[in-house]
């Protein structure tokens, strides 16, 4: 198993390019299942564990692909199976993205429930509701979602989401792209990754209006065509790298970005005292002498993203005062707090709100990753901690960050990946 060993106290400086977005890559790769012929060529796909897992799932279904230097070539013309087994789905919740494309293409689909998935007010319910609104019959049997169409093809319909869901919006769009007739989705997620999926489906041949808004209308087509497509940048990786510069008192320029998609995060950095400038597709940040506390509330786009709240919490441990962090998407997404406190942070939880008391002098020690973004927060804390920090179980980090230690090293961080035996 791998760990990251960090010698803290180095100011990060330099210029680095942002990677392609994982959160847009996954639904786009799933959408290739909608075309029964030809070859897709997808650019700027990040080299991540989650991408490899998703490719394995598509290979199991019959797809063929080749991935090299950020370019993924994929053909789904030989896909015959519409059954996604538990052995593959359990590795990643985003595997549910194959439900809509398989159902739309074959008229039936069997997709294992993601591991540990409990029903009730969970996002998976919204995926199933969307399929039913398009005319599917859904049953849950022996741990599988079994979906069938009643009229050969899915039928366009009205989908009104009670809450915003990126995953359910993506699945609904993909299913509607091959449905007969027009589908309107209200309270749709408006995240840039959904916008990218809309452009991808439209380029395949399914017209979509309302792109970038919470109301989407999509015209279904009987067939869709393979295309060449350029992926968008990863705004969460970009925010994490900006936080790395800010927490170490450094300065950084990110290239190949879209500042418009990061307004809430850039505004938070500005309020913290950082100097933020944008120029075309680049973002520059210079850390101040003393960071100011900034309260944030994680909500659907264009508000502050939930995938950045753990990193922001690490940053606020160095701010001159108390900050409040609220997550209205995942109310209890605070697994990183005990580990940050082990490093010397002073963070309390009150009424599903984190109270960060800063500034605190952090001291390096061993800490345990619990999930993707929690891992990133521990790396950020390690960059500013005195002494050596060991971040264990970095396979979580590898799910969503493309060679993060190499990028940080290029900016001046003293960080290296090492093997370790968890049970020794």
From Swiss-Prot:
A GO molecular-function annotation: UDP-N-acetylglucosamine 1-carboxyvinyltransferase activity
Pfam family, one: EPSP_synthase
Main location, first listed in the record: cytoplasm
Gene3D superfamilies: Enolpyruvate transferase domain (3.65.10.10)
Any one of the GO CC terms: cytoplasm
Top-level division of the source organism's lineage: Bacteria
Enzyme class: transferase
Transmembrane segments: none
Residue numbers binding UDP-N-acetyl-alpha-D-glucosamine: 93, 122-126, 307, 329
EC number, UniProt record: 2.5.1.7
Job of this protein: Cell wall formation. Adds enolpyruvyl to UDP-N-acetylglucosamine.
Protein name listed in UniProt: UDP-N-acetylglucosamine 1-carboxyvinyltransferase
Organism name: Chlorobium phaeovibrioides (strain DSM 265 / 1930) (Prosthecochloris vibrioformis (strain DSM 265))
């Amino acid at each position: 198993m791998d760990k990251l060993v960090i010698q803290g106290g180095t100011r990060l400086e330099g210029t680095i390019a942002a990677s392609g977005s994982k959160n847009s890559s996954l639904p786009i790769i799933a959408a290739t299942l909608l075309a029964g012929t030809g070859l897709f060529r997808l650019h700027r796909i990040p080299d991540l564990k989650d991408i490899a897992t998703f490719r394995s799932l598509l290979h199991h279904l019959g797809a063929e692909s080749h991935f090299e230097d950020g370019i993924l070539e994929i053909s789904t013309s030989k896909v015959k199976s519409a059954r996604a087994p538990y052995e593959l789905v359990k590795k990643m919740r985003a595997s549910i993205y194959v439900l809509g494309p398989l159902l739309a293409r074959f008229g039936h689909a069997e997709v294992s429930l993601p591991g540990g998935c409990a029903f009730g007010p969970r996002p998976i319910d919204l995926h199933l509701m969307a399929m039913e609104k398009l005319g599917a019959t859904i049953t849950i049997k022996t741990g599988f979602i079994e979906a069938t169409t009643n009229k050969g093809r899915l039928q366009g319909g009205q989908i009104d989401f009670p809450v915003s869901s990126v995953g359910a919006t993506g699945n609904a769009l993909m299913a509607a792209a091959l449905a007969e007739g027009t589908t309107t989705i209200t309270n749709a997620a408006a995240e840039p990754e959904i916008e990218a999926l809309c452009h991808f489906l439209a380029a395949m041949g399914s017209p979509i209006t309302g792109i970038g808004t919470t109301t989407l209308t999509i015209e279904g087509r009987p067939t869709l065509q393979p295309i060449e497509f350029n992926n968008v940048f990863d705004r969460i990786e970009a925010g994490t790298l900006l936080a790395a510069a800010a927490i170490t008192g450094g300065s950084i320029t990110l290239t190949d970005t879209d500042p418009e998609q990061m307004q809430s995060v850039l505004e938070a950095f500005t309020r913290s005292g950082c100097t933020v400038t944008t120029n075309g597709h680049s973002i520059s940040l210079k850390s101040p002498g003393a960071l100011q506390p900034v309260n944030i509330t994680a909500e659907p786009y264009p508000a502050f993203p939930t995938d950045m709240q753990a990193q922001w919490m690490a940053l606020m441990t160095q701010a001159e005062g108390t900050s409040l962090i609220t997550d209205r998407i995942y109310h209890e997404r605070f697994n990183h707090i005990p580990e940050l406190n082990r490093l010397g942070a002073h963070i309390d939880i009150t009424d599903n709100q984190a109270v960060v008391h800063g500034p605190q002098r952090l001291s390096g020690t061993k800490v345990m990753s619990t999930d993707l973004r929690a891992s990133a927060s521990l790396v950020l804390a390690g960059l500013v901690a005195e002494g050596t920090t060991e971040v264990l179980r970095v396979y979580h980090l590898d799910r969503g960050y493309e060679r993060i230690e190499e990028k940080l090293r290029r900016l001046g961080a003293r960080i290296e990946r090492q093997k370790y035996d968890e049970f020794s």
